[in-house]
């Protein structure tokens, strides 16, 4: 039976993950085994449960308990379900709950890149992409367009932040992902060394004098290719581009010279995922 608890005290510590903890506090880098992430909406929560993530607690609009989210409760065992009316929950969290439900999950242990990429042939590498909406959209494209893994550098947005998870529609739970290096100083040199040691050629998505078209036949023939995408404003750093085996451009019309990184990722995954 669901363990349903009516909210009577906004300051109760068990509500901290939903109301007061920052993203860094939720992540808990000092004690990663205690880290938490928040999933939002029944569909996203279902995908997290399907992937084996362990629920810690739920925050749910009262009418959802016997409504669209009832199926989720049956899958969450005795995890506490904190509930109130929609207006009260919005006051508590500071935002309108998508589909009236949030779930706090235990963060998974980080997986080594070497393990993630053991049998991978096409991976996405994200450098310094800090917009959670873009990160979520990139993961959704990576899942849909057959990327084997997504690798982030240490300055990238956490793929398990609430908005990235929501925008990805839970596909962040379906695509293996990991981090290249421990600190920003490890990128690009150490990160590129890891990719090379795993047999990957690297393709920087950037405009330069040596850029080849995304439909260049040599790219499709590469047995293992890492597609490197850069930050929203300035794109990839010059030393990252210089470290890559290829610099790749997307042919465009009407004088347009670039796309939003999430849109560019979808084009790149579609074209460069072909073998």
Predicted regions and their residues:
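Active-site/ligand-binding-proximal alpha/beta "capping" segment
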Residues: 203-254
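Short acidic-hydrophobic, aromatic-tinged amphipathic segments that line or gate anion-handling sites
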Residues: 4-11, 80-85, 176-187
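RNA substrate-binding interface of SAM-dependent RNA methyltransferases
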Residues: 50, 108-210
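Short, aromatic/basic amphipathic alpha-helical patches
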Residues: 67-78, 240
